[in-house]
Amino acid sequence: LAAVDCSEYPKPACTMEHRPLCGSDNQTYDNKCNFCNAVVESNGTLTLSHFGKC
């Protein structure tokens, strides 16, 4: 099972870094920062499906 440490999020701004990950919502996030911000907003219901595009 893939995991990402989101303990230092949310952050007010994310870089444009392109390292896609796929969330459990079947949405592709551009990078860890965007993904982790979404995880925080979802109150932890969003998880990582896998690294790379969905």
UniProtKB/Swiss-Prot annotation:
Keyword tags: Disulfide bond, Glycoprotein, Protease inhibitor, Repeat, Secreted, Serine protease inhibitor
UniProt site positions, description: Reactive bond 3: 16-17
Domain spans labelled Kazal-like: 4-54
Main location per the UniProt record: secreted
Gene3D superfamilies per the UniProt record, alphabetical: 3.30.60.30
Any one Gene Ontology molecular-function term assigned to this protein's record: serine-type endopeptidase inhibitor activity
Pfam (any one): Kazal_1
Cleavable signal peptide: none
GO cellular component: extracellular region
Compartment(s) of residence: Secreted
Statement: the UniProt record of this protein carries the keyword Ligase: no
Glycosylation sites recorded in the entry for this protein: 43
S-S bridge residues: 6-36, 14-33, 22-54
PANTHER family linked to this entry: OVOMUCOID-LIKE-RELATED, SERINE PEPTIDASE INHIBITOR, KAZAL TYPE 2, TANDEM DUPLICATE 1-RELATED
Domain text: Avian ovomucoid consists of three homologous, tandem Kazal family inhibitory domains.
Name of the protein described by the UniProt record: Ovomucoid
